[in-house]
């Protein structure tokens, strides 16, 4: 049995490239030494999540979350320390027979996961080992659901009795857990199972925990109106957030950075049988922003494979608007069929071929979707051009614009190529004017303006590392994506960087130097008069100094484990700074000079306040004393 001491944990972490680990969950792009992606811990549209593979940590400049590989697994999978270590060991291919000396904190949702897991097991047993289950399996087999599919998706059967689950689980869980589980209805002091006489599809979260169910009616004599009934909203189940099959699809999505989006369970099952694994379903509900935010953490491309009927096409139209045209492709399922029906008519190979080669771009779908029925009317044609021309104008390729202009001309009986082209060009010009209202701007002038706005001041003296560029490189370039206008060639930041004062930037850079240069830390540890301006930096300095004194070195992982959440976030932010390896004495002097000046300014303002208090109190002796101090302090500024 292995005890999880520091040495064992650190040895395990050393075997793992943290960027490889996190890329299983988040789509990462390389930028210099680091990797960036959309933060999985808060909703964002612009990447601010940094991963440093060399030093083995991550840090989000948006929400401040940070840590090492184990901390990431704890946060992302909502598990305790031991489970995170086990997951990391599995990823590294290391076998650990763990005996944990630490007290695991209970996940507050663990009982809800467990009661739903046990219900899923009971439903599956009923399907696989009862006479009623045999009839239900025959029904499923006729619809292409084999025993292999039943096993993979843990499909089950709710019996006709309305108290089967209650009788089997009521003695194992308390009333509060049962009430919160979503498995029961309560009426007039009676308890009934929420699902009866239905094929049961367990709904799991992305970590594989059962969080709810969707029950499908299967018998002809079933008078219930709803084809599917879902678990009502609970603490652990939110239909606007969860996606069916995400736990099984996640590894392939993360690897390929592409996800197929479908409407229902049977569609996903058909795709699985066709050998396509990166497929999820929104369970019949409309796609939401929550769904998209989750998937964008793993995928860069979305392929919409919705039903071919009008409802499915309407859903595609709304999804394009939610996701953004540049990241979407559409598979139009012919003949108004859904993917499951298509696989039955044309075989699994036919479905696989359709999913891969039948993709079209959003603009092609929108031209067909928005095409009016009555194109004999001139005003209708004009309105159609007004709708489509901005979409064509946004296309980055002139060749693509030309192709879709020609497609419009084929549709419109009263318009020729040059007329439609003129409408598109006008839209393009209007877009350029809107994007760049100030004329005669070049890239350098905008960069200077942006720099001034965010107070990225350079050091007055010549330094080996430029203060402005060092901080800009880390806190701007690696956090932001930039939109480059083809017409003006102007780089525009897509988000605002959290502002730090010039002093705060200098303090962070000095702390970085102390962490990685023992001579710098030693120099300031021997200066009794040295202090940082801001308390959070002074507190961190004290703990860095203590780490060095006790252990005669600074171990980043160990130090991080000794810090509070707020201190740890600040620590990771500081060691994320991408500074040159060498540090000159002149650089250190200049950094200290920057925040020393602010310290002197603070002292000056405090003396002014004290003077006002003394004057108000009529203390002439104190007024004279403070006046002299203010004069002397003014000379230091």
Swiss-Prot record:
Its cofactor is Zn(2+); Mg(2+). InterPro entries: DNA_helicase_N/primase_C, DNA_primase_core_N_sf, DNA_primase_DnaB-bd, DNA_primase_DnaG, DNA_primase_Znf_CHC2, DnaG_bac, DNAG_N, DnaG_primase. A zinc finger (CHC2-type) spans 39-63. CDD domains: TOPRIM_DnaG_primases. This is DNA primase. RNA polymerase that catalyzes the synthesis of short RNA molecules used as primers for DNA polymerase during DNA replication. GO terms for cellular component: cytoplasm; DNA-directed RNA polymerase complex; primosome complex. One of its GO terms (biological process) is DNA replication, synthesis of primer. The lineage of its organism: Bacteria, Bacillati, Bacillota, Bacilli, Lactobacillales. It comes from Lactococcus lactis subsp. lactis (strain IL1403). PANTHER family: DNA PRIMASE (PTHR30313:SF2).
